[in-house]
Amino acid sequence: MGEPVVVGRVGRPHGIRGDVTVDVRTDLPERRFAPGARLVRQVADGPASRPAADAAGAADAVGTAAGPGSAGDSGAARAAGPPVATVLSVVASRWHSGRLLVRFDGVTDRDAAEALRGSFLTIDSDECGPAVDPDDEDDDGELWWDRDLVGLHARTPAGDVLGEVVDVIHSPGGEILAIGRPEGGEYLVPFVREIVPTVDPAAGHIVVDPPPGLLDLD
């Protein structure tokens, strides 16, 4: 028995039949949220934490060379405080306007769906496959866990400090690094090799080589 790995977080209800939106934290949503899948709902006694670098449990990886469909579960977020766990079974799931909608067994109306809001959805770390690079033909790509990336300092090739990686966003179009700026606000940087050529957890930093306009916030 491994440790819980977060694959999603329940958002607001959708409609009146019990559907909920899910903030996906996995690159394998079609597998993790397929009908019949069983997920453990983790509810914190206190406020939910933001994704953290020291999240427990193994996780599938994201890679600088990987795009949509790369194998992985983030494992980068978990609830703060003693969790209360229950098992939810997926009845149906579908994409709607770029968001994943999920219906769970026994959740049949909007009130029941609202009661799930904010819950973390987890799987056992033993269910996570080995880290692989699915789209690097030369097998020389590198893969990184979310927990390896969050907390790293970001700088340009010239050495200018951009901030610190505060989150890894798993979107249908690929992974995005949220970099917190020292002066406030965030940069959103696509996690692809052309833009993030260097990831060095041992040195505590990444190098971001932004194309024109990427870091313009105005």
Swiss-Prot record:
The keyword Cytoplasm applies. It is found in: Cytoplasm. Keywords: Chaperone, Cytoplasm, Ribosome biogenesis, rRNA processing. It comes from the Bacteria. GO terms for molecular function: ribosome binding. One of its GO terms (cellular component) is cytoplasm. GO terms for biological process: ribosomal small subunit biogenesis; rRNA processing. SUPFAM superfamilies: PRC-barrel domain (SSF50346), Translation proteins (SSF50447). Residues 141-214 form the PRC barrel domain. The keyword Chaperone applies. Belongs to the RimM family. An accessory protein needed during the final step in the assembly of 30S ribosomal subunit, possibly for assembly of the head region. Essential for efficient processing of 16S rRNA. May be needed both before and after RbfA during the maturation of 16S rRNA. It has affinity for free ribosomal 30S subunits but not for 70S ribosomes. The PRC barrel domain binds ribosomal protein uS19. HAMAP family: Ribosome_mat_RimM. Binds ribosomal protein uS19. This is Ribosome maturation factor RimM. It comes from Parafrankia sp. (strain EAN1pec).
